[in-house]
């Protein structure tokens, strides 16, 4: 491939160089794309563009679609299970149209689709890894800002816009300016009860929502190495929340163990060859990054956001900050607006904040490990009176696994709603939304104004904190139970 060099390189530089098919001075590099993920929201206009130009999908074998953003995750109607794949379950006309359009486009252009009711349906960034489609060293794109999730495997994965979706569909390539690189060096070990979600929220609070802008970030250090693949995906998933183009973690035995035997992973001698190559995907000892950040994992405690962006967060033991204490006027102004929207007063203890809704799910924390963590806390307890708790698996496979382990019974016996797979309350594009003024503890990735429903107030938390909060009715950690 164009761009191969013997100079010391970072992980990101190695993957980038292996995919450059054309490079010219003063122009973006043209990258080959190994995997293109689609969903119903950002793909319709891209397919329309192909149709107007008389083009086909260049590599349907490298393209996969699912239905996730607009899909309902369940109703009180007991027949919902049997009607799961029926479009009649989608009551919103816009959502229904988007689902119908995706199905029609995939059928016309020969794209693999996992629709509602399919055994592999789920959130796009959950099903890619669980099917073994996501692999180290790949380039992966999707018309979705949390595509960086796949970087947990040592893939270069990033979100793209609709016009870029069309370009990849038509050519299986994408012109991209070469990004800068950054290392996040996580020193020390996480304390018991502190999760990957706490780590990444603490990182974003430290560097700010623009701290990674223009960079491909590599997360490094012993604390990262000790994380499961689910934990690593949580970290990589939120790379965009501090401005990074992508986030990557070098593959290792944990990665290989996760992928081994999955449906689309290499097998036999191909597996051995793949692992041999994947082992080369590490940053060279003498390679340099354009920027570096250090985070001390040993000092992190359960973390929660108080404002309206993921960088406005603090340890659960802290209080809502006073805007005047912040360093710059833009920060102070943003904090004032956030406190007004969130209906919070400076100095209020975060543990004193009562919630109306608790949401466990999303492409950040909707995997089996996340559900186990929430169930472990919830076991033997009841959801507080007046609190609604939704537990939404990230995929049909996760749901099936959870039910095989009896997690669904723990949730329902505690008074939580056990629902079907989808993006759900992560965003206000389906029936699972907050009402105006409702306050939620959510394991999702964004706490923007109106993100979970017009006028809804979101506090980002880990699955254990979410479960403890559901029991107490106020922001809490498992240690409080």
From Swiss-Prot:
Name the keywords, alphabetized.
4Fe-4S, Amino-acid biosynthesis, Branched-chain amino acid biosynthesis, Iron, Iron-sulfur, Leucine biosynthesis, Lyase, Metal-binding
The record's remark on the cofactor is:
Binds 1 [4Fe-4S] cluster per subunit.
Record has Lyase as a keyword: yes
Entry EC number(s): 4.2.1.33
Which GO biological-process labels does this protein carry? L-leucine biosynthetic process
Name the enzyme's class. Answer: lyase
Q: Which GO terms describe its molecular function?
A: 3-isopropylmalate dehydratase activity; 4 iron, 4 sulfur cluster binding; metal ion binding
* Biological pathway: Amino-acid biosynthesis; L-leucine biosynthesis; L-leucine from 3-methyl-2-oxobutanoate: step 2/4
Specify which residues bind [4Fe-4S] cluster according to the UniProt entry for this protein: 363, 423, 426
Catalytic activity as recorded in UniProt = (2R,3S)-3-isopropylmalate = (2S)-2-isopropylmalate
PROSITE patterns linked: ACONITASE_1, ACONITASE_2
Name the cofactor(s): [4Fe-4S] cluster
User: Which region ranges are annotated with the description Disordered?
Assistant: 437-463
What InterPro entries would the database entry show? Answer: 3-IsopropMal_deHydase_lsu (IPR004430), Acnase/IPM_dHydase_lsu_aba_1/3 (IPR015931), Acoase/IPM_deHydtase_lsu_aba (IPR001030), Aconitase_4Fe-4S_BS (IPR018136), Aconitase_4Fe-4S_dom (IPR036008), IPM_dehydratase_rel_enz (IPR050067), IPMI_cat (IPR033941)
Q: Which domain of life is it from?
A: Bacteria
Stretches that traverse the bilayer: none
What does this protein's UniProt record list under function?
A: Catalyzes the isomerization between 2-isopropylmalate and 3-isopropylmalate, via the formation of 2-isopropylmaleate.
| HAMAP family found in the cross-reference section | LeuC_type1
Q: How does it assemble?
A: Heterodimer of LeuC and LeuD.
NCBIfam families hit by this protein: leuC, PRK05478.1, PRK12466.1
So what family is this one in? Belongs to the aconitase/IPM isomerase family. LeuC type 1 subfamily.
Which protein is depicted? Answer: 3-isopropylmalate dehydratase large subunit
What is the organism field in this record?
A: Salinispora arenicola (strain CNS-205)
Q: Which gene encodes it?
A: leuC
